Swiss-Prot record:
Keyword match Signal: yes
Naturally occurring in which organism (per UniProt): Medicago sativa
Name of the gene this protein is made from: NMS-25
Entry keyword set: Nitrogen fixation, Nodulation, Signal
Phenotype when changing S195P: In strain: cv. Cardinal; clones 386 and 910
Outcome of mutating D150E: In strain: cv. Cardinal; clone 910
Function: Involved in the development and function of nodules. It might participate in the biological process of symbiotic nitrogen fixation.
Outcome reported for the amino acid change (mutating I245N): In strain: cv. Cardinal; clone 910
Protein name: Nodulin-25
Signal peptide coordinates: 1-24
Length: 246
């Protein structure tokens, strides 16, 4: 009986050990996942280690890199510090005076330039008026009008003409004629006898007679009116006389 109980306990212990091993084996995770992860990690570590081992830095590499980096960094820091100081720090006691003097000089230069531009670039209309006034102030100017040239009456005597246009339109006549103003030339009617006209009032009141009509002059003024001829309308001479009297 005693031996039987001992065998039973021994068999139970063996069973428990086998069961624990089976359970542990079945509950363990898939080994392929762990293996792949470990392999990737090992590959990365190997690459990094190989690159470091193949290209070791020289003895002066760190010094050169440090010097260039420090120079660039110092330059950037200096620029930043200068701009920061100029922007944030208040100006010194003498800065206000120097700045004020500089601004005053710039303003004076701008005002001087504006004054010169205003003086040199006067309006064209003002220049034209000044030129016109200067010409009028020089003295009287004799101007030959178009009415005088159009109504010029030729004569046989010499006539004094002051302008080039009058010389071009001059037609000699038989007797001398005195011409003083444009009004006299417009109202002047030549005749066989010389006549003198002194003033505008006398010219306005002057009425020529039929015998004093100069047919050449009237034909020049009124080319559509002709003397009585074989092919003209009766009464045109009377109409011409009436116009002369008017």
């Amino acid at each position: 009986m005693v031996y039987s109980n001992t065998y039973m306990l021994l068999g139970l212990g063996v069973f428990v050990l086998l069961s624990s091993h089976v359970l542990a084996y079945n509950m363990r995770a898939d080994p392929s996942i762990h293996d792949s992860t470990l392999d990737d990690q090992k590959s990365n570590d190997f690459v990094k280690t190989a690159s470091i081992a193949e290209c070791p830095p020289g003895p002066d590499t760190y010094l050169e890199l440090s010097d260039s980096t420090l120079d660039d960094q110092k330059s950037m820091d200096y620029v930043k510090d200068a701009s920061t100081v100029d922007h944030n720090c208040p100006p010194g006691p003498h800065t206000y005076l120097e700045l004020s003097a500089w601004l005053q000089e710039e303003q004076n230069s701008i005002d001087k330039v504006k004054k010169v531009l205003r003086t040199d670039e006067a309006p064209d209309n003002q220049k034209g008026l000044e030129y016109k006034d200067a010409r009028h102030n020089d003295g009287p100017i004799e101007i030959s009008t178009r009415t005088e040239k159009d109504n010029f009456i030729p004569s046989d005597g010499p006539i004094e003409i002051s302008t080039r246009t009058e010389n071009e339109n001059f037609i000699p006549s038989d007797e001398p004629i005195e011409i003083s103003t444009g009004t006299e030339k417009e109202n002047f009617i030549s005749s066989d006898e010389p006549s003198e006209i002194s003033s505008g009032a006398e010219k306005e009141n002057f009425i020529p007679s039929v015998s004093q009509v100069d047919w050449r002059t009237f034909h020049a003024k009124y080319p559509w009116i002709k003397k009585d001829g074989p092919n003209t309308v009766t009464g045109s001479r009377k109409l011409l006389n009436d116009i002369a009297i008017k």
